[in-house]
Structures are given as C-alpha cells and as structure tokens.
C-alpha cells in the first residue's frame, strides 16, 4: 500500500480510534506482514506525544506452539505479557493473516486450552476498557491470503478495506463521528427495550435485554466498525438460529451452523461442515454454550461476505450472536475463554428477515423501520 493511505490509516487510529494523549503508553502489536502500518502507527503515536512500543508477531509461531507445546506450556501465561496488559494505556492490534488456514491442522481442544489460559489476561484488559481505564483498537491489514478468502484481487480487496473504514473520504474521523451520531439513535431506542425477537430463514430466536446497556460501536475499538450490541440475559435465550455465512474461528471454519437454545444454553448444534470443531468450542468451558453478545450490523459500506468476522459482522442488514464471553460494559456477566461471532443475513437476497422489540417491528429485510 502507498504511504499516503497508510499515513491516513495510522493517523485515524491514533487520533480517532484510540484518541492517544501525551504520555500514554501504547502497545502496537502487529503481525509480520503489517510492519508498514505498524511503522506508520508508531510515528502517529509519537506525533501525539504518546510512548509507543511495537511488538511484531513472527509468522508461524502460533502453529509451532499449538503443534508442539506440552500441556504445561499450553497452560502457561507469560508474566511479562500479563504485566504489559495490566500497565498499558492503549493497545493497537494489527492483524495481517498471510495464511488463513495455518491452524487448520491443529487439534481444536489444544487451541481451546491455550485460549483459556490467556483469557483472564484479555478479560482484565476488557474490564479496564469498560471502566475507562484502558483503550484498545483492532484493525486488519490487507494481505494476499485475506484477499483470496474474500474472492478478490489484492488491489480490489485494499479498496474494499479502505472503503469499510471510510479512509476513502477526505476526513475519515469526521465521517465516523457523523456515523456515530446516526447510530446513537438506535442505541437510545434499544436501551428501553425488554424483549428482542429475530426472525429469518430457519431462524426464530428471542432473548431478554432489559436493563442491559447497548453500545454504539463506532470505530473506537474495532476498525472498521458499525454495529450496536449488548449482552442478553444469560438464561433468557430461547429458539433457534441458522447462520447464513460460514464462520471461522482459530483457523477453522464451520459451515451452515444451526443452533438451538433452551433456557439460555445451546442444547443442540449442527454444522454441514466443521461439526467436530463446533462441538469442541461449545465444550471449551461452562460459559461457552451461553450467548455473550447480540448485535445488529449497520455498516452499509460493507456489502459482501469476506470470510473475516471483523468485516462480516458489520455488514449492514445483518445481525450476529456471539457464543461465550460478554463485554462487561454491557452489564452482561457471562464469562468464557470463547467469544465466537456468527452472522445471520436478513437482506432480501438472503430470504429477508425481521427484528421485533417488545412485539413491535423495528427492522425489516435489512433496514431499520423506526
């Protein structure tokens, strides 16, 4: 990518997403292929008076660790990394997958074990962020592997990525502020709702959300963003949902996932492909069969499925439900080392769908009607 585009991206991360202030400690944690953006982000952080530190994740280390680590090593958490997560003011995570199938041959149970060991450290950062004590932003640098997954050339994928983040506009930060203001109207409405019901193809699922806090996800954490979300009451989810798109997690993919809920728990789960992995993730821990998040995608600049959740869950006209860990700022309490988002399309070309709030129609065939 050319320098001007990287500079605009990095400046938006520093000024809008993280709102870096003088003397704040910021960790820039980047995959190896994302070094150009990490370098630009480092400069932007310096220009704002922050204290940046860069960590580069070498390609292939995760696969080596999960294939060869002993059980003790899978359970071990680096004290230095834990201290870093406890002390930083901001985290900028830049994902750049060169091989999106690099973990496909890894035993899912080993992945779940390693993820569980590190979940407390991540949960601590989320709790600090929910209380205003820390900031984080996650973004995805385009690679040939990600472009191939999306069915696009690298050049077209780069344009897609830039458009999803509003980086093709003169003032991306102002565009996100305008978007945030428009999206806040939905948050204000949903904060007064007790019961939500989602109806779509092979889907009819209800949950209580009264007393929970809806979040306006407007690019300050996930970048790009464009969703409103909360955590449902843990024991309230009833019904079934059939997800439109294949869903990837930890390098594995499950296709045509259909889940049935009773009393807030998944009691039956089917996948046309990836059944073993789906069952392994559901058995990760006690909270893995409970929903930690319900969200509605509002970024109509994202129109196509790309096999990357960061973009797919934001598609305007979709909703997604996440199994496992809840975000503390929503006032939801489910805890799990798993957080797995799965997306259901409600647009007309997918068969349509509707969302009801306390019995009133609020969203139809991919569009808000309030």
Regions flagged by a language model, labelled:
Residues 1-239:
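Active-site bordering "gate/hinge" segments
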